Amino acid sequence: MTLTLRVLAPDQSVFDDTADEIILPSTTGLLGVLPGHISMVTAIDFGVLRVLKNGNWDSIALTGGFAEVESNEVTVLVNKAEMGKNIDSGKAEAELEQAKNQLSQNKDQGNSSEKIKAQETLNKAKAWFQASKSD
């Protein structure tokens, strides 16, 4: 028995295939999904979704959204997603360093919108860098 996984962003369908196991980056931590999993809906955090198929793991970088598990079908709706194998790791690393610098420049601004945006940029950059290194 397998799962059917769909990862959808507003501008594209990133993944639509079967999987043996899925690990989701939920807002409460990593969540493993196997065939026969109980039905549920969970919030998705910035992070890397891992997909096991035929003994091989694939990675998908995600920004926030939601996931629904229902009858061995998993649908992930996120603001942005990209397959790890399509991410240039050098560019992802440079963006991660730039995001770290941007956040450090805003560290004394309390909860200002600039600091919050810098933290979101850093979270996205971390997810893309991790996904680029996972494949």
Curated annotation (Swiss-Prot):
Enumerate the UniProt keywords alphabetically: ATP synthesis, CF(1), Hydrogen ion transport, Ion transport, Membrane, Thylakoid, Transport
Which Pfam families does the UniProt record give? ATP-synt_DE, ATP-synt_DE_N
Compartments annotated for it: namely: Cellular thylakoid membrane
Q: Would the keyword Ion transport turn up in this protein's UniProt record?
A: yes
Task: Return one GO MF term.
Answer: proton-transporting ATP synthase activity, rotational mechanism
Q: Where are the transmembrane segments?
A: none
Q: Which InterPro entries match?
A: ATP_synth_F1_dsu/esu, ATP_synth_F1_dsu/esu_N, ATP_synth_F1_esu_C, ATPsynth_dsu/esu_N
Q: What GO CC terms are in its UniProt record?
A: plasma membrane-derived thylakoid membrane; proton-transporting ATP synthase complex
Give the protein's function: Produces ATP from ADP in the presence of a proton gradient across the membrane.
Q: Which family does it belong to?
A: Belongs to the ATPase epsilon chain family.
This protein's assembly is summarised as: F-type ATPases have 2 components, CF(1) - the catalytic core - and CF(0) - the membrane proton channel. CF(1) has five subunits: alpha(3), beta(3), gamma(1), delta(1), epsilon(1). CF(0) has three main subunits: a, b and c.
Q: What is this protein called?
A: ATP synthase epsilon chain
- What species is given as this protein's source? Prochlorococcus marinus (strain NATL1A)
What is the gene called?
Answer: atpC
